[in-house]
């Protein structure tokens, strides 16, 4: 718990490099802890380690005892960062079709509309 507190504190203060070190250690120590995986992913994403963040988010979602669609939303963002627009759209449509949280659904819908508008402008 203390190590997690350090990682969380570094993360909250914007020191994602140190937070990443602690989260990585926590994931090695307790690999099936979905919160550690999600938090580790959340420090990889702003460092533009999109594939690593995506993989960690996916593991987090799979190990989670509940359907946390905010994780799939972040997976979609990582796919956008890696310019995998079709994969991003799949993530966002999965949210629209399965999620009951209107807040997450509306964010996913906004990305779908934005990506569709961009594809029409570029197409």
Label each PLM-derived region with a short phrase.
Residues 12, 46-47, 81, 114-118:
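Register position in tetratricopeptide repeats
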Residues 54-60, 88-95, 123:
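Alpha-helical repeat scaffolds
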Residues 1, 116-123:
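Eukaryotic alpha-helical solenoid repeat scaffolds
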Residues 80-103, 109-116:
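TPR/TPR-like (Sel1-like) alpha-helical repeat modules
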Residues 34-35, 65-72, 97-110:
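Boundary/linker segments of alpha-helical solenoid repeat arrays
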Residues 2-70:
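Alpha-helical adaptor scaffolds
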Residues 62-90:
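Ankyrin-repeat and related helical/solenoid repeat scaffolds used for protein-protein interactions
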